[in-house]
């Protein structure tokens, strides 16, 4: 470890040990990258994402309150309607007479359960493929959710819900005449999503299953947006960072902490995921056009070239902006970019500058290339040095 790196760690420690943390100092340090040693990044992100307040004295009580609240969400939302949950005040006889799976009432708990399953299956499909370049999300967590997995309780795991729902959809088929046929899943040669990764034994769960639970609870609490494909790519780096914290106490509560940080982050970017807002000033279309207007201001020659080739920002910037560049770089580089994004007071204005910098840094290739070549460049970005990109974005910011 270089003396410069040791000095940076000491600077962070000095800022973080103050009874009242000075946010501007923390932002200034974090913008240039947060050391991963000693759990510094995890702590800084929790402050920068407004999960932890600046007053250190209140951390213990707030963490206890929020983690307790998350446990309550688990109790309330990961249950199967129609099964007695004595410790939640739901008894079998109450459910049997008032509700049943064929109840047509839209407010029926069974109707809600089936709709939730549709959302759950989409989440399940997406989280199984999270960060395929590393094995982390397929490995077992050291801290499985005992509230869900303990055989002494009556909670149903999301894993079982997915298995049961998928099994029914695979084995029951209706032909064009409307006749329902039962088929054995063993005769189906198509690979099942459930078999894509080895299923862990009872009492264990993979990291992707934890992410699945976070997203499912978020969808339940936010029915207006629920779950949109791509949210998994936002929560993934957050959870990875918190679940690899060297401090076991922090790591044990990675799920709850990730949920609240993800919720706070989504409060800032959720408009990107709402299609009805695409063309509004807070929507994704406006932001994509802002990338091009910024490029026009900084490099008009390159802007005109892209316009001439009819390369619209929707062709590449939609993914860049919506997913906070999480699909353009390897996970460690994404995390480094997010250090700067989270630290910047106008963080998503800075994201626009990062996107603009990415274009300018490959300007020579773009000016020489035709439509096909340039689309390939933009959809499979060639530069891997994210520090170079961030430096260029900072130059653009300072030159305003």
From Swiss-Prot:
One of its GO terms (biological process) is intracellular protein transport. Its main location: membrane. Residues 35-345 form the Rab-GAP TBC domain. One of its GO terms (cellular component) is cytosol. This is TBC1 domain family member 13. The gene is Tbc1d13. It comes from the Eukaryota. The keyword Cytoplasm applies. Expressed in adipocytes. Keywords: Cytoplasm, GTPase activation, Membrane. Acts as a GTPase-activating protein for RAB35. Together with RAB35 may be involved in regulation of insulin-induced glucose transporter SLC2A4/GLUT4 translocation to the plasma membrane in adipocytes. One of its GO terms (molecular function) is small GTPase binding. Interacts with RAB1A and RAB10; in a GTP-dependent manner. Pfam families: RabGAP-TBC (PF00566). It is found in: Membrane; Cytoplasm. SUPFAM superfamilies: Ypt/Rab-GAP domain of gyp1p (SSF47923).
